């Protein structure tokens, strides 16, 4: 689907909202519902022209229908297109994602295309992008060879130098990068899961993780530890020239 043909596009990445089944309940000493709403308010006050939100997983900490329904109701009230991929805490049976979890989905913004991958595996904390999706991804990169590509998934492909979270990274990064290495139109890979900001470059591709809208994890920690950084989000300004 093509959303518009303007020259510049603003995409907001949010991640790891960890919503509870009741909006007053806390997650790790924070009310994730209130924090999520405050982050969104901060975004819309400063960025009046948003083309889409992309949520990179762990919408829910308690993954039941009413949790997801509150998320949907709130996001729909913003009157801005929004998309999401599942995280390890999400439940595909109740998830407000596309029904076919092993199908790769693509959203077009003029010369840019955002590709949504599902790295969540039922019953696992670790991530894995299955062969069916990798094959579809390769077909998409071939079909849209003239497009600038952004890929979004939940699990981080590369280590964060944080032992406890790195054991739960994307486990088949080599399979993913083997596909990406064949094409020169992939510009950005977005992920969540790690509750912190990070950046690295690989073969000219920018890999970003984004802060959670709830609690943050302490960087470079061998053991689970929280950080005092505030909740956050990522802004992508996509230009016609591919920058």
Feature annotation, model-predicted:
Residues 12-35, 60-61, 91-101, 123-131, ...:
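Acidic/histidine-rich helix-loop elements
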Residues 5, 179, 201-243:
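Binuclear metal-dependent phosphoesterase catalytic core
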Residues 13-15, 52-58, 82-88, 118, ...:
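Active-site neighborhood of phospho(di)ester-bond hydrolases with catalytic His/Asp-centered motifs
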Residues 38-52, 127-206:
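His/acidic metal-ligating clusters that form di-metal
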Residues 65-81, 168-177, 204-213:
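Short, electropositive alpha-helical surface patch
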Residues 23-25, 55-76, 91-103, 127, ...:
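Metal-dependent catalytic neighborhoods of phosphoester/phosphodiester hydrolases
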Residues 1-70, 160:
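N-terminal active-site segment of His-dependent metallophosphoesterases
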Residues 3-13, 106-116, 141-148, 201-207, ...:
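Beta-strand-turn-beta hairpins that frame and shape the catalytic cleft
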């Amino acid at each position: 689907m093509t959303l518009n043909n303007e020259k510049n596009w603003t995409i907001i990445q949010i991640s790891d909202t960890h919503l509870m089944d009741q909006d007053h309940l806390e997650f790790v000493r924070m009310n994730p519902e209130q924090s999520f709403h405050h982050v969104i308010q901060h975004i819309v006050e400063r960025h009046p022209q948003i083309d889409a939100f992309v949520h990179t997983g762990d919408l829910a900490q308690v993954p039941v229908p009413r949790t997801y329904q509150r998320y949907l109701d709130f996001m729909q009230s913003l009157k801005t297109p929004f998309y999401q991929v599942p995280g390890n805490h999400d439940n595909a049976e109740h998830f407000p994602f596309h029904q076919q979890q092993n199908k790769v989905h693509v959203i077009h913004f003029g010369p840019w295309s955002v590709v949504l991958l599902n790295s969540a595996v039922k019953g696992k904390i670790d991530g894995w992008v299955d062969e069916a999706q990798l094959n579809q991804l390769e077909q998409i990169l071939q079909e849209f060879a003239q497009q600038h590509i952004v890929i979004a998934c939940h699990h981080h492909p590369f280590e964060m130098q944080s032992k406890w979270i790195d054991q739960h990274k994307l486990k088949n990064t080599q399979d993913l990068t083997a596909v990406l290495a064949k094409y020169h139109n992939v510009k950005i890979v977005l992920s969540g899961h790690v509750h912190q900001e990070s950046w690295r470059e690989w073969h000219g591709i920018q890999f970003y993780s984004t802060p959670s809208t709830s609690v943050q994890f302490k960087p470079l920690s061998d053991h689970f530890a929280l950080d005092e950084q505030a909740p956050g989000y990522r802004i992508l300004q996509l230009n016609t020239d591919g920058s």
